[in-house]
Amino acid sequence: MRMDEFYTKVYDAVCEIPYGKVSTYGEIARYVGMPSYARQVGQAMKHLHPETHVPWHRVINSRGTISKRDISAGEQRQKDRLEEEGVEIYQTSLGEYKLNLPEYMWKP
């Protein structure tokens, strides 16, 4: 599968995540038939245009935390968008934003 095809499948899958729910990079990779491509799902999210309709903020890591970015404002933006959807997020002692993954997890 070419990467542009992979990205399209990833974006389509992410658009299926319901409001107020999240999924993980690995779960999206499995859903699109590329189970070892979790990091590439992250890259697909990174390449989205800022004004995209794809709900990128609903994809988190498998530990239930918002992944660190080069620009910390992105983490805050993801946290804010999830909280707007009713997802409860707390900050760990390490400064990570975390949520109760079993409560909010969406699996296709």
From Swiss-Prot:
Gene Ontology biological process terms, A to Z: global genome nucleotide-excision repair; transcription-coupled nucleotide-excision repair
Domain of life: Eukaryota
Keywords of this entry: DNA damage, DNA repair, DNA-binding
Site positions (Arg finger, required for nucleotide flipping): R39
A Pfam cross-reference name: DNA_binding_1
Site (Critical for recognition of O(6)-alkylguanines, probes the electrostatic potential of the flipped base to distinguish between O(6)-alkylguanine and guanine): R69
Residues marked Required for phosphate rotation/nucleotide flipping (site): Y25
Transmembrane segments: none
Any further remark recorded for this protein: Does not have alkyltransferase activity. A tryptophan residue replaces the cysteine at the known active site of MGMT.
Function: Involved in DNA damage recognition. Binds DNA containing O(6)-methylguanine and larger O(6)-alkylguanine adducts. The DNA is bent, the damaged base is rotated out of the DNA duplex into a hydrophobic binding pocket (nucleotide flipping), with Arg-39 donating a hydrogen bond to the orphaned cytosine to stabilize the extrahelical DNA conformation. This structural change in DNA presents the lesion to the nucleotide excision repair (NER) pathway. The affinity for O(6)-alkylguanine adducts increases with the size of the alkyl group.
Protein family: Belongs to the MGMT family. ATL subfamily.
Protein name: Alkyltransferase-like protein 1
Species of origin: Schizosaccharomyces pombe (strain 972 / ATCC 24843)
Gene it is expressed from: atl1
